[in-house]
Amino acid sequence: MTSLVVPGLDTLRQWLDDLGMSFFECDNCQALHLPHMQNFDGVFDAKIDLIDNTILFSAMAEVRPSAVLPLAADLSAINASSLTVKAFLDMQDDNLPKLVVCQSLSVMQGVTYEQFAWFVRQSEEQISMVILEANAHQLLLPTDDEGQNNVTENYFLH
């Protein structure tokens, strides 16, 4: 039987390595950033953080300023559609608004590697679905590649 572990950041690093997931740590926070999540259209940043014995998997996407009101109106439906994934808007004066989608796992009583692996996979899947749906409704800012394609398309249309 696998024993329960109350993981620290070192344990999370090892488990992510065991899962074959690349990550990096920045100088601004102690979170483990997941660059592969940026492959999903719209994802600006994704990370796993350990806060007060809770693992927090979160992803951020930049929101079109004109889409803040429609997205804010949809947040209740987004949050009601999942028991575990929660979304909110992060709006600060000096930055573009961001959609933050997160999922948490309490590890106060311990967690196994298998439970962590399942949590990470489920979080990736559910969080990416929320962001992909927001992107499909054109609520998010396009990535650099998408923005260049749209400029070209608009040029040919006019």
Curated annotation (Swiss-Prot):
Q: Which Pfam families match?
A: YbjN (PF10722)
Kindly give the InterPro entries that the UniProt entry links to this protein: Put_sensory_transdc_reg_YbjN (IPR019660)
Source species, domain of life? Bacteria
An individual GO BP term: negative regulation of bacterial-type flagellum assembly
The protein here is known as Uncharacterized protein YbjN
**Record organism:** Escherichia coli (strain K12)
Q: Corresponding gene?
A: ybjN
